[in-house]
Amino acid sequence: MEPLIALVGVTLALRIAGAAGVRRLRSWPVALRGGLATMFVLTGLAHFIGLRAELISMVPPALPNPGLLVTITGLLELAGAVGLLLPPTAPWAAGGLTALLVGLFPANVYAALNGITTSPEDALVPRTLMQLVFLAATVAVLASSVRGRRPRWRSAVAPASAQG
C-alpha cells in the first residue's frame, strides 16, 4: 500500500504546487513523473533494505539466483526513477518501467497464491488492482511524452479560404 500512497500523495502534492505557481509542475504528466519517481525510489530501495528477504522469497523457484534477480530489479527501479525526472529520458524510463511492472507481476502472483506475503494488500485481487494503477501511471507518462514529441505537420496547401 505504501507505493500507492507515495504515488498518489506526491503526484497530488506536486500538482498542487503547480497550481500554486510553480511553473514546472503545472502539468499532470510532470507531477505524475514525480509521483512515479518517488514510488520507484521507495520500491527500489526495498530491494536492498527492509524487505529484501521477502522479495527474494517471492521469486518463483523456476528462476535462477533469486538474490541477483532482486538486486537487478531494484537497480532497474532506481534507474527508472532517475530517468523519469529527466525530460529527455522520461519516455524511455516510463517504457522500461512499464515492461518491468509487467515482467515482475508473475512474482506477485506466485507470492499471493503461495502465501508468501501476509499483508492483505498483497492478496491477489488488491495487488492486481494496484499493479494496474501503476501500469496506468507509467503508460500515461509514456503516452504524454510520445504525444508531446510528435511533429506537428502543417499542410503544404493553403486552406481554401486563403485562396482567392
Residue ranges and their predicted role:
Residues 1-164:
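Membrane-interface extramembranous regions
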